[in-house]
């Protein structure tokens, strides 16, 4: 007879790990976390450490404002990944891939990977770009490549999760095109909430 799973019926654990330069990806991360909480999940929303040189940040007003005023006191850690049943990764596009800041954090996960501690969790990804064809899908796919190596089960946003996604969503994951430095609109935030809710639902089943 199988041993009972001590986590059975417990709330699913979701961690949202992201990099944001101006706050747009952070807004999507918070909406995703909100959607997961709506499904009863325990949620941690964690930015990764900023690694860009000061002179680069100084040259961009919105980047500088975010670095100086962002509200996060706790940054992402390996413990957050091990704790979670479901993981969401978020980053602005950088030439069709994730930002170096997020990649640097992910490059520290080798120990957890070697121990199999990231396998059989559920993963999903989201992004933002400044242009309509600036690499939204390729950035999400690039982040998902990490899940393949971890053995994490990949959960796309899809279109079936909510009717509104047929007109406003990206089936790869929540995304936002920030024209003229605009913040995510209601459609983008709804897509992120739907993604978070779906991640919590699937993670709960996997944790059981």
Residues covered by each model-derived region:
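Short glycine/serine/threonine-biased micro-segments
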Residues: 21, 84, 88, 94, ...
């Amino acid at each position: 007879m199988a041993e009972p799973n001590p986590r059975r019926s417990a709330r699913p654990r979701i961690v949202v790990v992201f990099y944001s330069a101006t706050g747009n990806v952070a807004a999507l991360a918070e909406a995703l976390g909100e959607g997961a909480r709506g499904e009863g999940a325990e949620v941690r929303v964690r930015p990764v450490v900023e690694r860009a040189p000061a002179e680069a940040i100084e040259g961009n007003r919105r980047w500088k404002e975010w670095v100086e005023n962002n509200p996060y006191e706790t940054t992402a850690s390996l413990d957050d990944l091990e704790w979670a049943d479901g993981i969401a990764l978020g980053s602005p596009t950088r030439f069709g891939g994730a930002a170096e800041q997020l990649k640097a954090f992910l490059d520290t996960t080798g120990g957890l990977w070697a121990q199999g501690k990231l396998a059989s969790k559920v993963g999903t990804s989201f992004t933002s770009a400044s242009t309509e064809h600036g690499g939204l899908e390729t950035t999400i796919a690039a982040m998902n490549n990490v899940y393949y190596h971890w053995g994490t089960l990949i959960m796309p946003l899809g279109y079936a999760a909510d009717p509104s996604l047929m007109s406003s969503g990206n089936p790869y994951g929540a995304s936002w095109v920030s024209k003229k430095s605009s913040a995510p609109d209601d459609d983008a935030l709804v897509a992120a909430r739907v993604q978070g809710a779906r991640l919590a639902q699937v993670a709960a089943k996997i944790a059981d």
